[in-house]
């Protein structure tokens, strides 16, 4: 925001930033203001019409007007640009606005081309107030200069019109000039009248912008006026004086209001000082007799502009004036903890002791400038308490502006607005600023209710909202008898031979209100039986005359007259037609006013008092077998057991809850078993294959994000009832943090008393079970020596130079149901025996979440690995690339001899350690170890003609589970994989005889001939085509424009 400079630094025109400091702020329903057809007024475009507003009620005239300031309007004053106007607007349907002539002259001069004053851009009409025949309008940016100085100073000036007299009032146009005096006073920035016909004027620029309040008597202003005297002294003037430099830049007089705050019956002066106390802001209250200080209020937040607006009215009806203070830049923390500008109004309630109790009212929108204007409304709804309007001129949709109406009450201000007025004009070059100026507390249409004017200077508009007369209705409804006996059927049902149980419904209306209301008021009344039953449900009671649950009636009521009543007969349906006997039958009465017939001559319609409900209801009860008091008090109990004491994580655990429900008291109506089930469980159904268990009707539903199974226990569930039922669930999807699953069970009924059983919680513990196994296989599992065509090579380079491939495969598999997150696999491999190599490891591979390391170098001789390794890895049976040297058992003649077992207890072993990651149910991790049988070792003479069993061993242990809060048992196991090496003799292969081959060929040809003959006899080779019509044959010919056109 822009503010005036300190000390003698000059700006031209001086004082303009101070006036615009408020202007440049960024751009429900008292329920009885008429928002349907408000009176709208418009002024010259760009004139800021609506910057200030007031009512004008001249005592000598029956007509009443609106006063609207347009401070940037052009006038007929010679040589003046945008001098500003105040317009008087007729509130009637004509809605014409005419400028009031306060000053028709141009600038006055000391001499030719030596001006004394400067009226262009003076903002006349920036403030306007009236009292009876008197109108005070000011131009706070009016400039003048003394004959001694050439500099212009914004002292401000006002014009006071009293009846037919119009005088100028410029108390700051004095010899006390310059910034340290009244040279920058901007007199008339804020104004008001007191009850004793004094004028109160604020000049926030006096004394280095300390600010000043000045008050003079209207009679003295008029009597002492002399157009030839520029600086007039008033004998009865009250004014604040200059203070210490610490009070500079405080802006006393920025806003003003009046009210009695010391009980002497004389209006005292209230002024906002928004930059006082190091920009905390203050509000001063001065004695209206001598300008002495009565009370001060200080803001709580720097730069909130506390005191931007002030108002005084008795809001709580205790006959003491209360103070309203606006701080439109106040910031509060939002739900995210961040500061945001919402604005605030402080309401200080005056007590009999003279102290004040302050309550805070924060704005509802960010950057709306809540509290920019505050207007007392008088008693808007005639409830005995004054009301208030608070504006947020940059709130609402597209920043069009909002005015909130708050009602007074004995404890102060109702914090919830009863009505919200919204601007409807879009922004032009600046925001509409709907609500920047407001004035209420005047009954312009004489209907007994005060009205409200709202200005929107950004779109050059002013709006008059008239208050609608309030009608208070007293409605009565009586039902008798209130206890309905279904067995007592005494009323004939029209059109039948049946008799029904009936009861009487008596409904009454009385209406009254203050102000201009018609003597007769038309209402429409609607009655509805069994109101609380949902739409489409069977209503248990009907009216006898129309056999319907509803009845409509038009009633004409005399305003202020006696209660007017009518009576109807209603009856109960037969008990076979409905279930619910326990819930009360609600009889509901609602009424509406016929607003069109109640409107006044101007079309203004009254409104029903919103604080009086527009409906009334009564209840009737069906007589029950529940003792003399007709109140059933059941005693409901539930217990539960299950067929499973433990549930394993990861498994689809079937679980059956055996529930026992019983009632040891009086009947329970619409009784239901409610089972709240955990997220890990799904409802399967009711156990129906047991004679001992009741076959309940159950359904799954979600209630307030709680998953429930609801089972019907009867209506009523009679005294002494015991039910045993089985409910089947599937429990799965347990989380890693769960330790149990919990079911909550309760019996609920619709009874009024003792309607539910205690909640019973049943827990089933969770457990971990992981069936982990390790399996191994050798591929091949036998190798037979000697190997044909194998020759020793001193420096082997390929696999064939060493010997046949031997692959051991180990699979670690989790059969579940639970998962584990970490395990260790230890492999021991028979590597050497007596310094002779046994199984030479070429490489190892893994499949699955596993990482391995070995304690020796793998393939240190860098023997080239065959390309067939991939296929062999996936072949768990064997599969060396060259099977010519492998001989199966049935092909061999074994040499019986000693079998030497070479495992890690005898041979030197290489160790491979693997860390296995998470394995869920059904998952596995596989280790493939590819090696070569070191044939040289077994071809040594001392090792021949022996059988060898080469054994590798693998063991595992699970070391970690993902379940943090459950006890875990150790899981471990081991296995061995054996490769047998055996010496044997390979028999010579026997060739297939030629005659066998010839016979096989002939047999095949004979079979083919037989098949062809059979198919021929069945007509398989005969082709049958359907006849084609001529048109179809023509379509096969090329078209004229087709590719086959012969002319092309």
Curated annotation (Swiss-Prot):
The keyword Cell wall biogenesis/degradation is annotated on this UniProt entry: no
Protein name per the record: Integrin alpha-V
Record-stated family: Belongs to the integrin alpha chain family.
UniProt topological domain (Extracellular) ranges: 31-992
Record flagged with keyword Nucleus: no
GO MF assignments: integrin binding; metal ion binding; virus receptor activity
Binding site for Ca(2+) 1: 260, 262, 264, 266, 268
Record's keyword terms, sorted: Calcium, Cell adhesion, Cell junction, Cell membrane, Cleavage on pair of basic residues, Disulfide bond, Glycoprotein, Host cell receptor for virus entry, Host-virus interaction, Integrin, Membrane, Metal-binding, Receptor, Repeat, Signal, Transmembrane, Transmembrane helix
Cytoplasmic topological intervals: 1017-1048
Subunit structure: Heterodimer of an alpha and a beta subunit. The alpha subunit is composed of a heavy and a light chain linked by a disulfide bond. Alpha-V (ITGAV) associates with either beta-1 (ITGB1), beta-3 (ITGB3), beta-5 (ITGB5), beta-6 (ITGB6) or beta-8 (ITGB8). Interacts with RAB25. Interacts with CIB1. Integrins ITGAV:ITGB3 and ITGAV:ITGB5 interact with FBLN5 (via N-terminus). ITGAV:ITGB3 and ITGAV:ITGB5 interact with CCN3. ITGAV:ITGB3 interacts with ADGRA2. ITGAV:ITGB3 interacts with FGF2; it is likely that FGF2 can simultaneously bind ITGAV:ITGB3 and FGF receptors.
Subcellular location: Cell membrane; Cell junction, Focal adhesion
Organism: Bos taurus (Bovine)
């Amino acid at each position: 925001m822009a503010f005036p400079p300190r000390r003698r630094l000059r700006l031209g025109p001086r004082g303009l930033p101070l006036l615009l400091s408020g202007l440049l702020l960024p751009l429900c329903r008292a329920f009885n203001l008429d928002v349907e057809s408000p009176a709208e007024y418009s002024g010259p475009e760009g004139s800021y019409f609506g910057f200030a507003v007031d009512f004008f009620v001249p005592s000598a005239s029956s007509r009443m007007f609106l006063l609207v300031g347009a401070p940037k309007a052009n006038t007929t004053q010679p040589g003046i640009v945008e001098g500003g106007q105040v317009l008087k607007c007729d509130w009637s349907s004509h809605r014409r606005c005419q400028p009031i002539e306060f000053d028709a002259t141009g600038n006055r001069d000391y001499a030719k081309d030596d001006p004394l004053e400067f009226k262009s851009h003076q903002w006349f009409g920036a403030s306007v107030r009236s009292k009876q025949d008197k109108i005070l309008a000011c131009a706070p940016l009016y400039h003048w200069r003394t004959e001694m100085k050439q500099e212009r100073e914004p002292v401000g000036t006002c014009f006071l019109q009293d009846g037919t007299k119009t005088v100028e009032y410029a108390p700051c146009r004095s010899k006390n000039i310059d910034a340290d005096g009244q040279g920058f006073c901007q007199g008339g920035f804020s104004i008001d009248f007191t009850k004793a016909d004094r004028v109160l004027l604020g000049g926030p620029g006096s004394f280095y912008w300390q600010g000043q309040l000045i008050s003079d008597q209207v009679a003295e202003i008029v009597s002492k006026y002399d157009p030839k005297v520029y600086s007039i002294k008033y004998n009865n003037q009250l004014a604040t004086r200059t203070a210490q430099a610490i009070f500079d830049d405080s802006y006393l007089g920025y806003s003003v209001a009046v009210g009695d705050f010391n009980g002497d019956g004389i209006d005292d002066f209230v002024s906002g000082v928004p930059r006082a106390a190091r920009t905390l802001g203050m509000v001063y209250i001065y004695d209206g007799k001598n300008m002495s200080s009565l009370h001060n209020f200080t803001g709580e937040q720097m730069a909130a502009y506390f005191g931007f607006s002030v108002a005084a009215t008795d809001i709580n009806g205790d006959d003491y004036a209360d103070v309203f203070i606006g701080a439109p830049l106040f910031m509060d923390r939002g739900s995210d903890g961040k500061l945001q500008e919402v604005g605030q109004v402080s309401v200080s309630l005056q007590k009999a002791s003279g102290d004040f109790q302050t309550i805070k009212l924060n704005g509802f929108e960010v950057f709306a400038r809540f509290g920019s204007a505050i207007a007392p409304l008088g008693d808007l709804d005639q409830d005995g308490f004054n009301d208030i309007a608070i504006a947020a001129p940059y709130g609402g949709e597209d920043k069009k502006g909002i005015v909130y109406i708050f009602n007074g009450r004995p404890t102060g201000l109702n914090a919830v607005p009863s009505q919200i007025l919204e601007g409807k004009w879009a922004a032009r070059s600046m925001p509409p600023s709907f609500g920047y100026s407001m004035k209420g507390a005047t009954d312009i249409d004489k209907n007994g209710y005060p009205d409200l004017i709202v200005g929107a200077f950004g779109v050059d508009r002013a709006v008059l909202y008239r208050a609608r007369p309030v009608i208070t209705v007293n409605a009565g409804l009586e039902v008798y008898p209130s206890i309905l006996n279904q067995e007592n059927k005494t009323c004939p049902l029209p059109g039948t031979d049946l008799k029904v149980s009936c009861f009487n419904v008596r409904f009454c209306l009385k209406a009254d209100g203050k102000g201009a209301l018609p003597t007769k008021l038309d209402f429409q009344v609607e009655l509805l039986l069994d109101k609380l039953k949902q739409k489409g449900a069977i209503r248990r009671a009907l009216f006898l005359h129309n056999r319907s649950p509803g009845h409509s009636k038009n009633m004409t009521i005399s305003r202020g007259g006696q209660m007017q009543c009518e009576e109807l007969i209603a009856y109960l349906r037969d008990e076979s037609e409905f279930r619910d006997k326990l819930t009360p039958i609600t009889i509901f009465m609602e009424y509406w006013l016929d607003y069109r017939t109640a409107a006044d001559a101007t079309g203004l319609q009254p409104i029903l008092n919103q604080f009086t409900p527009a409906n009334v209801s009564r209840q009737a009860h069906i007589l029950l077998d529940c003792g003399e008091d007709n109140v059933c008090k059941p005693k409901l109990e539930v217990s539960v057991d299950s067929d499973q004491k433990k549930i394993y994580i990861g498994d689809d655990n079937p679980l059956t809850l055996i529930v026992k429900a019983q009632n040891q008291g009086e009947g329970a109506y619409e009784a239901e078993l409610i089972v709240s089930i955990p997220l890990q469980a799904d409802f399967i159904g009711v156990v129906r294959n047991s004679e001992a268990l009741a076959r309940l009707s159950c359904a799954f539903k979600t209630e307030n994000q709680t998953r429930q199974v609801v089972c019907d226990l009867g209506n009523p569930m009679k005294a002494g009832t015991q039910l045993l039922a089985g409910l089947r669930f599937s429990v799965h999807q347990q989380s890693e943090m769960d330790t149990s699953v919990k079911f909550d069970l309760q019996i609920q009924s619709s009874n009024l008393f003792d309607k539910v059983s205690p909640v019973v919680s049943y827990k089933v513990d969770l457990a971990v079970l992981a069936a982990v196994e390790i399996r191994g296989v050798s591929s091949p599992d036998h190798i037979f020596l000697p190997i044909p065509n194998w020759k020793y090579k001193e420096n082997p380079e390929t696999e064939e130079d060493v010997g046949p491939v031997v692959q051991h495969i180990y699979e670690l598999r989790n059969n579940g149901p639970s998962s584990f997150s970490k395990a260790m696999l230890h492999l021991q491999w028979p590597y050497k025996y007596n310094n002779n190599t046994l199984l030479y490891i070429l490489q190892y591979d893994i499949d699955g979440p596993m990482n391995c390391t070995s304690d020796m170098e793998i393939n240190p001789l860098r023997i080239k690995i065959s390309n067939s390794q991939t296929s062999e890895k996936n072949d768990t049976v064997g599969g060396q690339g060259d099977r010519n040297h492998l001989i199966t058992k049935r092909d061999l003649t074994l040499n019986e001899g000693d079998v030497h077992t070479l495992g890690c207890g005898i041979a030197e072993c290489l160790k491979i350690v693997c860390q296995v990651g998470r394995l869920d149910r059904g998952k596995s991790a596989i280790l493939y170890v590819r090696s070569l049988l070191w044939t040289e070792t077994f071809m040594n003479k001392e090792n021949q003609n022996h059988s060898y069993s080469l054994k590798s061993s693998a063991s595992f242990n699970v070391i970690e589970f993902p379940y943090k809060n459950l006890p875990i048992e150790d899981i471990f196991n081991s296995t061995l994989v054996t490769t047998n090496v055996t010496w044997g003799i390979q028999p010579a292969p026997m060739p297939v005889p030629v005659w066998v081959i010839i016979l096989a060929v002939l047999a095949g040809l004979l079979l083919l001939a037989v098949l062809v003959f059979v198919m021929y006899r069945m007509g398989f080779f005969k082709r049958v085509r359907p006849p084609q019509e001529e048109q179809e044959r023509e379509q096969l010919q090329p078209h004229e424009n087709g590719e086959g056109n012969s002319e092309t």
